[in-house]
């Protein structure tokens, strides 16, 4: 069994030794990827990041793998992306076809996730051109698009959407990106998502819609935006009648929007009218009359179907 000293000594020879000596070691059967330094870096890893590109090209020519993570779980490609080292990324792609684009960090982040953290657009474009999975998810089920929106990187988000990213992708809790931005109260991001096809009535694993979240969290501007975008008010296990009435009253939400949403809601007709009348929800009288007429007409039309 080889000692750690000998292993590290072989790493040093592979990473820093004369190339003729390296070639002799490889001919003798030394595994080019097995020998690492104390940080878990292979000779290829080390030479790329110390700038010895001729040696890196030599090692790649002799089948050194770019896919071996260091002690922090980061591959060469992942760290190049994090550092926005575009020239070295291109060098790697030009000198080997053996690059796994989907090896993830300990947090489950792919290189594409990493590229979005700092909105490294050129790195994103290069990865997507090489076939990176645009909807790949991390350990929490979040796609790269989740991260761009949550961190308000809308330029990166637009690039992902233009390449086919799923705007309604769900995480491990079945929350969509629209659900997740409620806590940030990011109106600009919400508008961006809705303009790009986000489903305003989609439910998570607790049957909450984005509107439910906005109402419960008392985010008036978001709630009104969702209502304007076709969100429907609903009552169920997650939002009973009293809670809904009190929350709407507390927010002083636009009555016209509530009125219009109730017309398309699957709440029963009696409850719709009661919602405008009870619990001190003071809708204008013409709204109540309009709703009553609408409900009456709905009953008449239903009778003739």
From Swiss-Prot:
Keywords associated with the record: ANK repeat, Repeat
SUPFAM superfamilies: Ankyrin repeat
Pfam families referenced in this protein's UniProt entry, alphabetically: Ank, Ank_2
Extent of the ANK repeats: 5-34, 39-68, 72-101, 107-136, 140-169, 173-202, 206-235
InterPro entries hit by this protein: Ank_repeat_dom-contain_49, Ankyrin_rpt, Ankyrin_rpt-contain_sf
The organism's place on the tree of life at top rank: Bacteria
Family matches, as Gene3D superfamilies: Ankyrin repeat-containing domain
Name of the protein in question: Putative ankyrin repeat protein RF_0580
Organism: Rickettsia felis (strain ATCC VR-1525 / URRWXCal2) (Rickettsia azadi)
């Amino acid at each position: 069994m080889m000692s750690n000293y000998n292993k590290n000594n072989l790493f040093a020879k592979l990473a820093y030794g004369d190339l003729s000596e390296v070639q002799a070691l490889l001919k003798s059967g030394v595994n080019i990827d097995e020998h690492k330094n104390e940080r878990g870096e292979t000779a290829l890893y080390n030479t790329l990041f110390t700038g010895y590109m001729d040696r890196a090209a030599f090692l790649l020519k002799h089948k050194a793998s770019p896919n071996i993570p260091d002690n922090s779980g980061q591959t060469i490609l992942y760290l190049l992306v994090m550092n926005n080292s575009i020239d070295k990324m291109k060098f790697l792609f030009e000198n080997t076809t053996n690059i796994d684009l989907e090896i993830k960090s300990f947090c489950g982040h792919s290189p594409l996730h990493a590229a979005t953290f700092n909105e490294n657009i050129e790195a994103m474009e290069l990865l997507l051109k090489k076939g990176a999975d645009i909807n790949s998810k991390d350990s929490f089920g979040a796609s790269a698009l989740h991260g761009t929106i949550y961190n308000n990187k809308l330029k990166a988000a637009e690039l992902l959407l233009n390449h086919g990213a799923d705007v309604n992708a769900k995480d491990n809790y079945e929350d969509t990106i629209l659900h997740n931005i409620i806590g940030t109260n990011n109106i600009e991001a919400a508008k961006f998502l809705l303009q790009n096809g986000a489903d305003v009535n989609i439910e998570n694993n607790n049957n909450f819609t984005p509107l439910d979240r906005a109402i419960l969290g008392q985010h008036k501007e978001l709630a009104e935006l969702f209502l304007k975008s076709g969100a429907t008010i609903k009552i169920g296990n997650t939002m009973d009648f009293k809670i809904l009435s009190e929350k709407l009253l507390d927010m002083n939400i636009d009555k016209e929007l509530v009125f219009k949403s109730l017309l398309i809601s699957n709440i029963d007709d009696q409850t719709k009218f009661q919602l405008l009348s009870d619990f001190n929800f003071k809708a204008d009288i013409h709204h109540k009359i309009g709703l009553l007429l609408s409900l009456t007409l709905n009953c008449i039309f239903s009778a003739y179907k």
